[in-house]
Amino acid sequence: MSKAVGIDLGTTYSCVAHFANDRVDIIANDQGNRTTPSFVAFTDTERLIGDAAKNQAAMNPSNTVFDAKRLIGRNFNDPEVQADMKHFPFKLIDVDGKPQIQVEFKGETKNFTPEQISSMVLGKMKETAESYLGAKVNDAVVTVPAYFNDSQRQATKDAGTIAGLNVLRIINEPTAAAIAYGLDKKGKEEHVLIFDLGGGTFDVSLLSIEDGIFEVKATAGDTHLGGEDFDNRLVNHFIQEFKRKNKKDLSTNQRALRRLRTACERAKRTLSSSAQTSVEIDSLFEGIDFYTSITRARFEELCADLFRSTLDPVEKVLRDAKLDKSQVDEIVLVGGSTRIPKVQKLVTDYFNGKEPNRSINPDEAVAYGAAVQAAILTGDESSKTQDLLLLDVAPLSLGIETAGGVMTKLIPRNSTIPTKKSEIFSTYADNQPGVLIQVFEGERAKTKDNNLLGKFELSGIPPAPRGVPQIEVTFDVDSNGILNVSAVEKGTGKSNKITITNDKGRLSKEDIEKMVAEAEKFKEEDEKESQRIASKNQLESIAYSLKNTISEAGDKLEQADKDTVTKKAEETISWLDSNTTASKEEFDDKLKELQDIANPIMSKLYQAGGAPGGAAGGAPGGFPGGAPPAPEAEGPTVEEVD
């Protein structure tokens, strides 16, 4: 059985799943949650990922990083990055035109790229899967929003590499959700619209599903719209209300903001099932308690424009697929934000009262589909996956700049991938020795309005009048939606090519290798820390249980012996209180000291008729019935039993 998993790397939450024996398991994390917050926190002593990181966000706002997906593959001066910076409690800095996150970690200032933060979340998902499956997990299918551009896809793939994963494929979230919906559907062709509104991104895809063939007809979306934006509206609303009531601006205090944001997120969820909810935060800012309430209608009004804007991509997809809305057979809602009643109502009204299909779990569908795809790519023989074929599309048109800054498209948007397209171009001036080939993606007529993916030079063209040399440019989009471009001059056979990986902002091979090594180092440190804590806890529990056993020993021991052990145990406990950051070795030494004193006395107690019932096995060297202690260097240690 292959141990390949599907990972839904979300803006706010991530989810991991595994396909085996004809079924998909969504894997719960160590807290028992089936989704894990995409949060990473750095403290003086350790690095926290997931629930642990999110839970301490209010105490440590400037070193708790979230929303890396809104930064990944983007430039620092991207207007959306600039707008987000205003909401982020952590510090973003500009490194070679790319955003990096600056935090304090173990007493020093560290910079991390969004890829590194995402790789830590992916690493956490990998560990979650490994502890459930009981085996190493190397291969994964990772999902991205369908509307992610080339650089965002490439950066996500890099994050997987840094996490020590072999990324089998990057697939689009709505397509993965469609697999979850259609895996058991057999029979006539149906048109399915996937409406995926998550924590930070929004996608709409239209597919035709027939007998295991999933063909994406068109896709559209907004890589910067989701639940976070609704939270922001609530946060701003309450900041204003707090100002009105108390004449104070709490937005200057990051801790207050984080507590308010957490309360807003909770309120938003409650409003999906209740018509109104109260928000109560004690001592929010400068000792002022903030008690207020909000109705569903008010929330809908605050987010009205955002909710309405979700219908634009729906219209675009129908136009691109040349379908009328009456021809859509099923509407499938994916992503936590589709639980908002107003969003559901807008969709239903748009499709003239047609109710959306609720057969799949909106939080888990994407990871589910990714797990199925991972099983297929690693050769799973299940009957369910045998005939499954995925035909996805490139979300944005791809082309090169020709004379006058014109965008000449080679691959139009919504072309099925993988795809390959060649065109012949020529020189613009007589005796031109070389051409600069600039690759863009986007829908506008002029390249300056589109996104530059990369450029390369094809030189050594022999002198000739303009228009004579023949330069063949080939675009090749692979199944991850990542582009390779090559150019060859027909006369001389001179060629040059690049994988478009956004030269401007792409991590180089060396960068990635360095980050992989760093990730290993962090992992080792995390493990060291957890071993240190285990030693500390062991010492503490043994000291306390010794104290208790002695106090219940009655006249089975001489008073002098009892005093000796009690004194040593109390000494150990007070040492622990003042040395919480000691090393593992120090804790182990203290344990040995304690056991050297206690073990001989405790064995007297056991020979005198055993420890009192309640303390059986609680003391170190707890050998019931006076069995001799095992010959161990440190004296036997017994796990506590209830």
UniProtKB/Swiss-Prot annotation:
Region Disordered: start-end pairs: 606-642
Residues modified to Phosphoserine: S62, S551, S603
NCBIfam families reported for this sequence: PRK00290.1
Organism: Saccharomyces cerevisiae (strain ATCC 204508 / S288c) (Baker's yeast)
InterPro entries named in the record: ATPase_NBD, Heat_shock_70_CS, HSP70_C_sf, HSP70_peptide-bd_sf, Hsp_70_fam
Localization per Swiss-Prot or TrEMBL: Cytoplasm; Secreted, Cell wall
One Pfam family of this chain: HSP70
GO molecular function: ATP binding; ATP hydrolysis activity; ATP-dependent protein folding chaperone; heat shock protein binding; protein folding chaperone; tRNA binding; unfolded protein binding
Keywords: Acetylation, ATP-binding, Cell wall, Cytoplasm, Isopeptide bond, Nucleotide-binding, Phosphoprotein, Secreted, Stress response, Ubl conjugation
Origin superkingdom: Eukaryota
Biased composition (Gly residues): 610-625
Residues modified to N-acetylserine: S2
Function recorded in the entry: May play a role in the transport of polypeptides both across the mitochondrial membranes and into the endoplasmic reticulum. A functional difference between SSA1 and SSA2 proteins is expected. SSA1 can participate in the ATP-dependent disassembly of clathrin-coated vesicles.
CDD domains, A to Z: ASKHA_NBD_HSP70_HSPA1
Chief place where the protein resides: cytoplasm
The protein's assembly and partners: Binds human HTN3/histatin-5, a peptide from saliva, and mediates its fungicidal activity. Interacts with polyadenylate-binding protein PAB1 and Hsp70 chaperone SSA1 on translating ribosomes. Interacts with NAP1.
GO cellular component, one term: fungal-type cell wall
Cross-link Glycyl lysine isopeptide (Lys-Gly) (interchain with G-Cter in ubiquitin) per UniProt, renumbered positions: K556
GO biological process, alphabetically ordered: cellular response to heat; chaperone cofactor-dependent protein refolding; clathrin coat disassembly; cytoplasmic translation; mitochondria-associated ubiquitin-dependent protein catabolic process; negative regulation of DNA-templated transcription; proteasome-mediated ubiquitin-dependent protein catabolic process; protein folding
The keyword ATP-binding belongs to this UniProt entry's keyword annotation: yes
Similarity field: Belongs to the heat shock protein 70 family.
Other facts noted in the record for this chain: Present with 269000 molecules/cell in log phase SD medium.
Designated name of the protein: Heat shock protein SSA1
